Amino acid sequence: MISGKGHPAIFGKNTIKMKRMMIWIILLGGMVQGAFAQNLEIKGMVRDARNKEILEFANVVLQTMDSSFVAGTTTDMKGHFLLNKIKKGSYILSVSSLGFKTEYISLEDLSKNTSLGEISLNDDAVSLDGVTVSASAQTSHADKKVIFPSDRQMKASGNGMDLLQQMMLPRVQVDLLNSEIKATGNGVVQVRINGVKVEQDEIKALNPSDIIRIEYHDNPGLRYGNADIVLDYIVRRPDTGGSFGLDMAQGINSMWGEHNVRGKINHKNSEWGASYRIGPRDFYGMKRNNEEEFHLANGTTLNRVEIGEPSHARLFMHNLNVNYSYQKPDKYLFNATFRYRNNHQPHWDYQGVLMNKANPEDKVDMIDLSGSAYQAPALDLYYQRDLKHNQTLVFNVVGTYNQTKSTRIYQESKHEQLLTDVNNVVDGDKYSIIGEAIYEKKLTNGNRLSGGLRHNQSFSDNSYINGHNYKTHMEQMESSVYAEFKGKVKKLDYSLGVTVNRSSYSQRGEDADYERYTVSPRLTLFYALPGESSIRLKSTMGNVTPSLGELSAIDQVIDSLQIQRGNPNLKSYMSYYTELNYEFRKGLFYVNALGAYEYQPDAIMDEKYLEGNKIIQTWDNQKNWQRVVASVNLRVGPIKDILQFSVNGGMNHYMSNGNIYTHRYTNWWCEANVSATWKKWSLWYMVMTNWNWFKGETMSGGENIQGIQLGYRHKDLMVGLRVINPFTDNYKQETENWNQYASFRRSNYIKESSRLFIATISYNFSFGRKFSAGQKKVNNADNDSGVMSTGK
């Protein structure tokens, strides 16, 4: 009989199975519960604390309490962010954006979905030392833009100048043929490293990976003098040890080179540094075509055409910098720099045939041979003292000696009979000293007060030999005092400044001394618009003094018909400049639009007049000169962290009103840059049409140039191949003069600059820990030789 309680063995087995099933259900439930428990969310919105505008692409990073990375994201187009799949625990959330202070939020014992609401970030000028930026970023201020290069841009660059080309900044051009940084519209570019003004060859010496950011001053303050653009490279500061670098670019199919070597040694508070640059050029395909039209005093009209033949050009440029600095952080900085510049140009020769256009059989042979040598040693002493209550004092003294020697032989001959023989020799010595003192005070709410004194005094002794022996002794002095205040009212940033200037000049044996006092105010208004856009209005007044070469009371024979003559009666004049700038950023797109007007009454401009059977070229204070400028810069990228391009274009309209002439000239120009990177490879292409300049009666043409470069990087070594003007064989620069008595249209060619292949190599290494000297706030230099040049 079967019992009603069941079989004990069977009952025991079922009990065991049920227990196992219960355990698995409990474990599975715990896993599901744990999985849901781990899937926590953190969300919020980021705004600008000042104007409550949303902040796109702000960085949001979640870290553990010991700073280990957990998750990260960026805000979207509406300023929102979301972090999901977060485990329970305690965290720190950091929210940052370029130009703002980082906000830290403590999230202790996070166990549920959390909404942080609105997070406000306050303004700050940040330094991203040690942080990799995945996309080039920029923050704009009234006087400057702070730009952080991306990792992609740094990997595609072999030096600091290459990096500038990759960043595609508005109004900044990198001239690959002449290896220099330029500002569109003949502007003055000043370059610095950690606040210290340096030469452009030292920018080429920078290792891109050491560059934290570039402070692009497109509205420089009064303490920057006459600079139109200031580029300040902020680099990492070494602690101890040293570094060495080499940067070389050598033409393959012609003699064109740019080579730079540099090194630094650091010990405790001291730094020793040196750099040397050499730039050889040796061309045999240089020529000049020129068409001139003369209307002489006797009623004769002569239309003469110069048909150029290939000639020789040779140039060697040497730059040496030796530097010592001693710094006590937050106390003082002493910096001493010795600079030596030497440009040796033994040949800059033209030859060809001069033909009478009315009678092509009427020809003469022509040679125009020039040579020059220039050297300028300079000693720069700098002292900066940091005081209490955010105050700084700066003292700077620079002494420079400029020595210039030049020769020119111009001859016209027919059937080996010499018709015209011009032999000019110039020997010039110039001594100058520049002294400056600056005071700065940081106030509350980001306001700043600064003031300074500056004095520049020069003495020039020149000898001109051209059948006669002329000697000139000239003295020129310029003193100024300035004050500037920068403040902020809600969304409006403003800057008010004024400079009082005294300029004087005297020339021995000439009754043409002058002394002039001027007051030059300056105003800047900067307003942040909704979104990432802004508008800026700038208005300046400045005093312009004549150069010593223009003031020299001597004659220089140019050819059989023309003489160049200095004018000791020239006076300084004022320049009035107003600029309106609009800037817009949205995701990958950046737009910068500019409109400007400049007015110079009594401007010093060229003129020509008849004197007997000769035509005199000289300078005088004319009625006025005006220009209207409009330009637009569009930059897109990086796209997929691979491609970036920019397009610039604009119009220049010049109004030149002389005492006896009136001219109008309009120039349209454009420029395009494309950069692509893939892994260790980089490709870059640029094309630029002529930005032409017109003043007085002369149009000076810009460059019409193209360039393409392929590069490969391996650690600190980068090699590349560059081609200048790969698709053209007629590179030229044009100049025109519209004078009623002696007009010309001239084209200068250098055959080697077309399809010029250049091999490049950049290498940097360091040893030990690093340390860098402090930031030097000013640097002065005298680059005016003080002599009058001659020639066509």
Language-model regions, residue ranges each:
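Face-selective signature of the C-terminal outer-membrane beta-barrel domain
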Residues: 317-345, 368-510, 589-597, 626-651, ...
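Membrane-proximal, glycine/serine-rich, low-complexity loop/turn segments characteristic
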Residues: 38, 61, 78-80, 101-103, ...
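Short, acidic Ser/Thr/Gly-rich low-complexity loop/linker segments typical of extracellular
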Residues: 65-80
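Short, ordered, surface-exposed loop/turn motifs in non-cytosolic proteins
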Residues: 50-64, 140
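A short, solvent-exposed loop/turn motif at the edges and junctions
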Residues: 63-68, 90, 94-106
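Outer-membrane beta-barrel translocator domains and adjoining extracellular loop/strand segments
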Residues: 285-301, 347-363, 405-416, 461-469, ...
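Outer membrane beta-barrel strand-and-loop segments of large Gram-negative receptors
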Residues: 432-434, 565-567, 571, 577, ...
